[in-house]
């Protein structure tokens, strides 16, 4: 009874004599919002579970989605970045070339690099989706470890992307980012082949 009275007080339900209660219009809207939140939470948990797995197929699928999003992110960054942002991006990559040694440092640089480009895209939905895909620390360190074991020169790809963005050539920025993510996909595929985890 107390819970029902609280619902009445909050205008979520309304008593109809001795017949019981019905939801108000506000109550129906509120219920729909709760249902939407429940669905989003379920979707988020499923996606987080995928991000924490290390199977070849799941890593490849995550990288395929990243490729689509990050191509657009780089293209928009070439169009929308301020001069100050471009200078900072270039300085950050140039400084990192000589400083990075450990997996953690490389992973931190890689996160920062992709995060800066997403910021410069000026697309909030794109940025938040990429952040969700990129910022799984476990996944990111795994990808860095795989790339290092495959002998990848991670920063070489970054320099190409930066040069295209700083040159303000959207198509070149898109292509450079696509090639970068493709090399990551190839490294992951070759790594799993070597580990005999895929045929």
Language-model features: where?
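Amphipathic alpha-helical recognition patches that constitute DNA-binding helices
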Residues: 18, 22, 112, 172
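Conserved amphipathic alpha-helical segments that form helical-bundle/coiled-coil interaction surfaces
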Residues: 62-142, 158, 175-182
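C-terminal all-alpha effector/ligand-binding and dimerization domain
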Residues: 134-199
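Short linear motifs at protein or domain termini
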Residues: 1-65
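Residue-level "hotspot" positions that anchor or transmit function at local structural transition points
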Residues: 61, 105, 149-153
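Structural signature of alpha-solenoid helical repeat scaffolds
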Residues: 15, 101, 146-149
């Amino acid at each position: 009874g107390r819970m029902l009275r609280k619902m009445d007080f909050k205008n979520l339900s309304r008593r109809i004599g001795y017949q019981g209660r019905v939801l108000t219009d506000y109550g129906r809207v509120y219920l729909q919002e709760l249902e939407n939140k429940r669905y989003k939470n379920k979707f988020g948990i499923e996606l987080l579970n995928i991000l924490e797995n290390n199977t070849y197929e799941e890593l490849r699928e995550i990288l395929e989605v990243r490729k689509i999003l990050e191509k657009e992110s780089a293209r928009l960054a070439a169009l929308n970045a301020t001069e100050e942002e471009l200078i900072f991006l270039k300085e950050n990559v140039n400084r990192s070339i000589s400083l990075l040694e450990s997996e953690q440092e490389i992973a931190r640089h890689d996160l920062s690099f992709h995060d800066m480009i997403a910021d410069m895209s000026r697309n909030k939905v794109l940025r938040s989706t990429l952040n969700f895909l990129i910022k799984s620390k476990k996944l990111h360190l795994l990808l860095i470890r795989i790339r290092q074991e495959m002998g990848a020169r991670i920063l070489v790809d970054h320099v190409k992307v930066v040069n295209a963005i700083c040159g303000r050539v959207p198509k070149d920025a898109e292509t450079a980012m696509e090639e970068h993510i493709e090399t990551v996909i190839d490294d992951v595929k070759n790594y799993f082949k070597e580990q005999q985890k895929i045929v």
